[in-house]
């Protein structure tokens, strides 16, 4: 509302400022009272203390500007008409500066009073008496009442909420209460004049729909849901008992294995071995497993057990003097899962599919050297047989069909080396499509590799002693 700084005087008039008293911003902007033109200290604005700057020219100062009683009249020649606010200053102070842009909708106007007047309260009471059956004004009605009563929307909503609460305490309710507050209803349903709860026809329709839904729940296509729910609960209880029984069986099985392995185990090979058998044992570099390894394999499920869980593969004798030490465990009886009614209905089909898949896997495994022996570090010698042993089971890759097809690893075992005098009987035996010369050559290579590995082991055993000896000499 003040004049802009720095653009008040032209250069021709600036020469006369040396003889004029200094002007402050309060003097330039126009005094509101008579005291604004007077200097507070006297010496800052006029050469004499207590003198006024614009009432008369001071003695000893000649100024080309003629001062009058109106302070703003001296600047009329230099300031254009758009900047002349002398006529509008008085009117600008009459209204609140923040209420004008909002117009007639006084949203958040600080000029409005906090409490409602008597006229506003009378208007709101009249509307409430007319709508006693549904005292929930819509958004449009609230805006209209706020305009009439010169209140805000928040004040109108609060007044109606308090009025409904007061009538409810006085037991003067003539309407059906709502589950949600009217503010949420107004925000979500702005154009909703009538609520569904107030319309009896819609209430009847909703009741019919609820009744139909209940009938459908009782008998959909003639099936009783209560009976099915009871079966589901029974199935869950049976499932829990089945899980407990399986856990008990696992514990008993582990305890039986630990008890069977707790007494001192007899030597894997009989002491009265022939020199030929001992030489073969030295050739294949076999080391027997300890009790800890037996326990380790007994406690952990083996991959071969997982393959042969649902079926038992019939292993036939491969050679005359060698028998497979691997015998699959008996097939476990498949129990139907009671997770749901659909699982019960389809459990028989799943059992059939599972058994068929297991039979196919078993036949393919039998065709591709399932009965081949394990690695030298995991299998006993050819003279030691454990027909009922499930602990010394082979790794999974010895029984997978594709592995012998690539490497024929199973034919390199010591079980097919034909020890003793009966080796000449089976000299022309063909195993897995490989001739006997090929087998002999492969066995020779395997023996050479084992001799090399044994010599390396001996060297490795001797090196620590030599190192210690060399260090002591140093």
Curated annotation (Swiss-Prot):
Tissue distribution: Early in gastrulation, expressed in cells beneath the blastopore lip. Subsequently expressed in the neural plate in overlapping patterns with other irx members, which all share an anterior border of expression. At the time of neural tube closure (stage 19) in regions of the midbrain, hindbrain, neural tube and optic vesicle, where expression continues during tailbud stages. In stage 34, expressed throughout the eye retina. Does not appear to be expressed in the developing heart or pronephros.
UniProt cross-references to CDD domains, sorted A to Z: homeodomain
Location(s), subcellular: Nucleus
Keyword annotations of the record: Developmental protein, Differentiation, DNA-binding, Homeobox, Neurogenesis, Nucleus, Transcription, Transcription regulation
GO BP, sorted A to Z: brain development; cell development; dorsal/ventral pattern formation; embryonic cranial skeleton morphogenesis; gonad development; neuron differentiation; proximal/distal pattern formation; regulation of transcription by RNA polymerase II
Bias kind Pro residues: ranges: 263-273
Classification via Pfam families: Homeobox_KN
Region annotation (Disordered) ranges: 174-222, 252-294, 453-474
One GO MF term: DNA-binding transcription factor activity, RNA polymerase II-specific
Function (record text): Acts partially redundantly with other irx members in neural patterning. Required for formation of the posterior forebrain, midbrain, hindbrain, and to a lesser extent, spinal cord. Patterns the neuroectoderm in both the anterior/posterior and dorsal/ventral axes. Does not appear to play a role in pronephros kidney development. Involved in craniofacial and gonadal development. Modulates the migration of progenitor cell populations in branchial arches and gonads by repressing CXCL12.
Protein name: Iroquois-class homeodomain protein irx-5
Lineage: Eukaryota, Metazoa, Chordata, Craniata, Vertebrata
